[in-house]
Design a protein with these regions (language model features):
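N-terminal Rossmann NAD(P)H-binding glycine-rich loop of SDR-like oxidoreductase domains
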Residues: 7-29
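Conserved Rossmann-fold NAD(P)-dependent oxidoreductase catalytic core, especially the SDR/UDP-sugar
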Residues: 87, 91-147, 155
Length: 348
């Protein structure tokens, strides 16, 4: 028997790429109800019509709640009867957050705190929150807000565990291919328009994972988490230059135009810091970074003289397995978006 049988799952930011993929995964499950919580009524209406057209028998288990994680009351109103939450609501565009950093604070930090407080008060059993590799050694506003979000998660997880209630954990992603606002759809659109691909820096490296892998990571965290745990998938990486060549190999070569890095971009991303590797556990396809459950009484650690040796290096898109162009082609072909684009099927 699955933990999801006859349960109610709420997905914040549920009309986004991740929420749509989770919905497909669970539509035929024995979940009693799936609650889509988001602030965009148009996307909710589009999703509702698509469900009714394609899945008329199971669409009735999906309920829509208009609200904003910034508004605590709207979250509390959607919370009664919820067993589990996947918290995906976020501002995630790096350049936009650079220009409007307080908006990232309001959604990514305060919004997450609102969700977790409401979940704890409502007796939700388990919450899995979604973070990003940009939270590790952050240099931009989005990454800083997500790093603070992670610490909000750990603090709330500690409080909830002390009360013996909600289990709260976190997942950290690399680049989720073909999610909204990501670069592969932009490359495809540029090629179809006959324009050159715009590349920031061909030597940049990024982790690559598809949306199904993103859902699998959340489900693994759901099944294995202790309070405050962080879960990371072992991921392949590619240079932006090779990623562009892979897309051109599939859709045609219209040339490239190197435009330079955008606001707040890194040469490479970090999924797990040296400091986190100290507390990490290799779980096969994933790493678990256990919560740091020390309290503020540091004297006992000094008196006992506990010493931990730091890991040699972080886990980054520069030192993970690097895909060549052919490997990158195979990787991006695992996405439904690219498969549809090759067939001429419009992507929503």
């Amino acid at each position: 028997m699955s933990a999801f049988d006859n349960a109610t799952l709420m997905i914040t930011g549920g009309t986004g790429s991740f929420g749509s993929t989770v919905l497909k995964h669970f539509l035929e499950s024995d979940l009693k109800e799936i609650r889509i919580f988001s602030r965009d009524e148009k996307k909710q209406d589009d999703m509702r019509h698509e469900l009714q057209a394609k899945h008329p028998d199971t669409a009735k288990k999906v309920k829509f709640y208009i609200g904003d994680v910034r508004n605590p009351q709207s979250i509390r109103d959607a919370m009664p009867g919820v067993d589990y939450i996947f918290h995906a609501a976020a501002l995630k565009q790096v350049p936009s957050c650079e220009f409007f950093p307080m908006q990232a604070v309001q959604t990514n930090i305060i919004g997450t705190d609102n969700v977790l407080h409401a979940a704890i008060d409502a007796g939700v059993k388990r919450v899995v929150c979604l973070s990003t590799d940009k939270a590790a050694y952050p240099i931009n506003a989005m990454g800083i807000s997500k790093a603070m979000m992670e610490h909000v998660i750990y603090a709330n997880a500690r409080v909830a565990a002390e009360r013996g209630g909600t289990t709260i954990c976190c997942t950290r992603y690399g680049n989720v291919m073909c999610s909204r606002g990501s670069v592969i759809p932009l490359f495809i659109d540029q090629i179809k328009a006959g324009n050159p691909i715009t590349i920031t820096d061909p030597n940049m490296t990024r982790f690559l994972m598809n949306l199904d892998e993103a859902v699998d990571l959340v489900l693994f965290a759901f099944q294995h988490a202790n309070p405050g745990d962080l879960f990371i998938q072992k991921s392949d990486a590619s240079t932006i230059g090779d990623l562009a060549k892979a897309v051109q190999q599939l859709f045609g070569d219209t040339g490239t135009n190197i435009i330079g890095t955008r606001h707040g971009e890194k040469l490479f991303e970090t999924l797990m810091t040296r400091e986190e590797r100290l507390r990490s556990q290799d779980m096969g396809h994933y790493f678990r970074v256990a919560a740091d459950n020390r309290d503020l009484n540091y004297d006992k650690f000094v008196v006992k003289g506990e010493v931990h040796t730091m890991a040699d290096e972080s886990y980054t898109s520069h030192n993970t397995e690097r895909l060549d162009v052919e490997g990158t082609v195979k990787k991006i072909l695992t996405t439904e978006y690219v498969q549809n684009a090759l067939k001429g099927i419009p992507n929503g």
